[in-house]
Amino acid sequence: MSRICAICGKGPSFGNNVSHANNKTRTVWYPNLQKIKAVRNGSVKTIKVCTRCIRSGHVTKAL
């Protein structure tokens, strides 16, 4: 799964862009994912994690 956070499972959101003339076009909003090296199950892995999980300390970064 390419655009899903490995920690919280956050993925894309779907909806409409609505113009001033009330025209609607479908759009997708993707989470802000970053590739980081993290300690998972005692080993270092490169995973995609959203910035909210990084900031809130749900991930232990590998040094």
UniProtKB/Swiss-Prot annotation:
Chain segments annotated as transmembrane: none
Entries under InterPro entries matching the protein: Bacterial_rp_bL28 (IPR050096), Ribosomal_bL28 (IPR026569), Ribosomal_bL28/bL31-like_sf (IPR034704), Ribosomal_bL28_bact-type (IPR001383), Ribosomal_bL28_sf (IPR037147)
SUPFAM superfamilies per UniProt: L28p-like
Gene Ontology cellular component annotations, sorted alphabetically: ribonucleoprotein complex; ribosome
Keyword Ribonucleoprotein listed: yes
This protein's UniProt keywords: Ribonucleoprotein, Ribosomal protein
Family, as annotated: Belongs to the bacterial ribosomal protein bL28 family.
PANTHER family referenced in this protein's UniProt entry, alphabetically: 50S RIBOSOMAL PROTEIN L28, LARGE RIBOSOMAL SUBUNIT PROTEIN BL28A
Protein name, UniProt field: Large ribosomal subunit protein bL28
The organism of origin for this protein: Pelobacter propionicus (strain DSM 2379 / NBRC 103807 / OttBd1)
